Regions:
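Beta1/beta-strand and adjacent pyrophosphate-binding region of the FAD-binding site
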Residues: 125-137
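N-terminal Rossmann-fold NAD(P) dinucleotide-binding loop
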Residues: 140
């Protein structure tokens, strides 16, 4: 593989001195017993690369990157890809205690993260909608835009920064297939307007913004569902960059996640395979 460019950010560290750095990551090929982790990376702080390679474990956990001497409050933190094969990094933790026990269970980790990032324990109320669409690929875009044009108040939730899914500027899979075929001759009208999102991303975003009853939420990943009996009452989404959570209420939900995530979270029957 060809390593990708470094990913960097600035963080504020309150005290000078020695800090120990952990990353929550794993070897994503370990379920298939691949001996050498394909997604390895290192962390650099203020340009100094820490000792240990990361992305080696067989499950999501905190791996020790190394220690660093901090001299200023503002510091650069950089992920340095070593392989070009999709390394995973969920979070980076700076601690004065090398032997600290860091939460890793789902519930404990969520509470720990919210505490450190000052995120409220309860999600923000995102309001009630006539229709909530989860996923903004071509299917989600079509459902949301058409719903808004029919007069519905629509929330379109996308877990990527850009619309289009596989047809977006991130992936660029060409849109193809039959449209406007009997007996559903109107099926495909919105897709004909959109065409290939990757070639007209700004225009697609403008289409979304033009619909006055359509609210668009990029970078929000739906991870939880609440139900009354068998009926979905709300979905909760987390911002993939800052961790903020918003709960969206509706009586109608469309799963356009591409992987059936919403249906799975709601307890729907499913199968795994290829067609």
């Amino acid at each position: 593989g060809k390593p990708v460019q470094d990913a960097s950010t600035e963080v504020m560290i309150p005290k000078k001195g020695t800090w120990h750095v952990y990353a929550r990551t794993w070897n994503w090929c370990s379920p298939w017993k691949v001996k050498e982790a394909p997604g390895r990376f290192k962390i650099a702080v203020n340009g100094a690369v820490l000792d240990n390679e990361l992305g080696m474990g067989t499950q999501w956990d905190w791996e020790y990157a190394g220690s660093v001497e901090i001299k200023n409050k503002s510091n650069s933190v950089t992920l340095k890809d070593l392989t070009g094969f999709e390394g995973r990094c969920d979070a980076i933790l700076f601690t004065k205690d090398k032997n600290v026990v860091i939460p890793n269970r789902k519930e404990d980790l969520s509470a720990f993260r919210k505490q450190l990032l000052n995120i409220p324990a309860k999600p923000e109320d995102g309001g009630h909608y006539d229709l909530v669409v989860v996923g903004a690929g071509t299917a989600g875009l079509s459902a949301a835009i058409k719903g808004a044009r029919e007069g519905l108040k629509v929330a379109l939730i996308n877990n990527r920064p850009v619309p289009g899914g596989n047809n977006s500027t991130e992936i660029r899979v060409v849109a193809s297939g039959e449209m406007n075929v009997k007996p559903y001759t109107a099926l495909g009208n919105v897709i004909r307007e959109i065409r290939n999102v990757y070639s007209k991303e700004d225009q697609v975003i403008e289409m979304i913004q033009t619909e006055k009853t359509l609210s668009y939420f990029p970078n929000m990943h739906v991870f939880a569902v609440s139900k009354e009996g068998k009926q979905i009452k709300s979905v909760t989404a987390k911002h993939i960059e800052n961790g903020k959570e918003i709960e969206f209420f509706s009586s109608l939900f469309v799963d356009c996640s591409g992987d059936g995530n919403l249906g799975y979270l709601a307890g729907a029957e499913y199968r795994v395979g290829r067609e």
